[in-house]
Amino acid sequence: RFIGLFLLLLAVSILLYFFFTLRKTPTVTQTPIEIINTYTNSVDGFSIAYPKTFTLDSGYGYQGFGPQETIRGVSFVIPLAIATGTNLGNDSYISVEHIPKITTCTIGQFINLTQGAMPYTIIDGGISYLVASSTDAGAGNRYEETVYVREGLTHCYAIRYFIQYGAIENYPKGLVVEFDKPSLLSAFDTIRRSLVITQ
């Protein structure tokens, strides 16, 4: 009888020990470290930070107005891992573009306003931007562009978000998932906010 009582008390003690020990053990959340690179263009007078997983294209030129009106700049193409398994095109990117030697800078110099783009102004982090977006489609693909033109500068700079993706309804069911657009835009926003104009 006493042995049974002793064993019962021992079992209860062990359970209480593990219960309070586990409660006091902190849970450690592993936060991925984003390695950042900085691109500096001393000729065009700007620098910008971007994740190391993005691909830098310093020979980038925007040709939305035709090859004769190429806007020079630099682009940062999304990592393949973001697009894999989704309907997002792996050629989506964010770019910094600069039009030199002009006295008046307008958003219409960076995006075709005849396609329904309606400019508006935002203030983000104390910086004023003129913003306009456009969409296009072809062969089952969708193309979205949003341009941010920095206001109040003596030189003409813009940041472009270019997102290409396939219409999700055109894929066999279960083949891909719809890409996380808010997360992608958040990543682009972070890069945009890091732009520093040095001239």
What is the predicted function of each stretch?
Residues 1-11:
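N-terminal Sec-pathway targeting helices
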Residues 16-28:
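Hydrophobic single-pass membrane-insertion segments
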